[in-house]
Amino acid sequence: MKKIVIGIDVGISTTKIVGIDASGMVISPIRIKATDPITSLYGAFGKYLHDNRIALDEVEHVMLTGVGAAYIDERIYGLPTSKSEEFVADGLGARYESKLDRMIVVSMGTGTSLVKCDDNEIRHIGGIGIGGGTLAGLSRIMLKTDDIKQIINLAKDGDVSKINLLIGDISAKPLPGLPMNATASLFSNAKANASREDIAMGLIWMVLQSIGSATILSSLESGIKDFVLIGNLTLLPQCREVFPAMEKLYGVRFRIPKYSEFCTAIGAALDYKRQTK
């Protein structure tokens, strides 16, 4: 009996895949890297079915989303296959994982998109061209590597105060609403001989703080105080430093759900149920 809906978030080089069973449970999400979206998709799908001992006739439907989905117009392994609009998938997945009905979803990928969820309304409200691609590109120039594991390891020994200018550097007293350790200017305190460790930390903070600030600004006049972070950048350890500091400063809540990396794939699978109601 067909029970499982497969959601696949197809990137250019990375594909994420999840299954959702009849009870609504998420089954063993995985990610696969490859040189192109077709190889990535079929590699991920085959591995997923094999690892979870799922037969083809147990799959009710396959839902595709993500930029790489545009390259695929055929049925996957002959199975019924449809597509989910990526921003809708972002919203559905984040709503499912966070259990919130009203929020802004912050999809931190190569760049960053912002999706407003207000009960059943899911709407893309903008974004910024800063994200994982920014971190990788600047790291290639400044650190001579775009290996995210190496960047994270360097940042562990970095001191962001040697890179960013803080309020305490320019004022003898806190400013209204701004404590002494708040950032006045990103990278403004960097020296010509800054260490690779400090640069790595500064780059990560710059990307995360920029995303956080854009998110808060996007929420003005909406009354929304809950922001759900999804995508690969949620795996950065510095998220546990940057976003709590912004929560305290602005009175908002940044949430990283359990399957933050896979929310878009989860949302794609959920969209099938929504489309067939």
Spans of model-derived segments:
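Glycine-rich phosphate-binding loops at beta-strand->alpha-helix junctions
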Residues: 64-70, 217-246, 261
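Short beta-strand-loop/turn "lid" adjacent to the catalytic site in phosphate-handling enzymes
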Residues: 30-34, 45-46, 50-86, 119-124
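Glycine-rich phosphate-binding/hydrolytic loop that grips phosphoryl groups
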Residues: 92-97, 135-139, 254-277
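Short glycine-rich, Thr/Ser-proximal phosphate-binding strand/loop in the N-terminal lobe
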Residues: 2-43, 122
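Conserved phosphate-binding catalytic cores of ATP/NTP-utilizing and phosphoryl-transfer enzymes
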Residues: 1, 72-106, 111-121, 266-274
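Conserved phosphate-binding/catalytic loops in two-lobed NTP-binding clefts
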Residues: 81-87, 244-266
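Glycine-rich phosphate-binding loop plus the immediately following alpha-helix
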Residues: 120-175
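Adenine-nucleotide phosphate-binding core of ATP-dependent small-molecule kinases
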Residues: 176-226
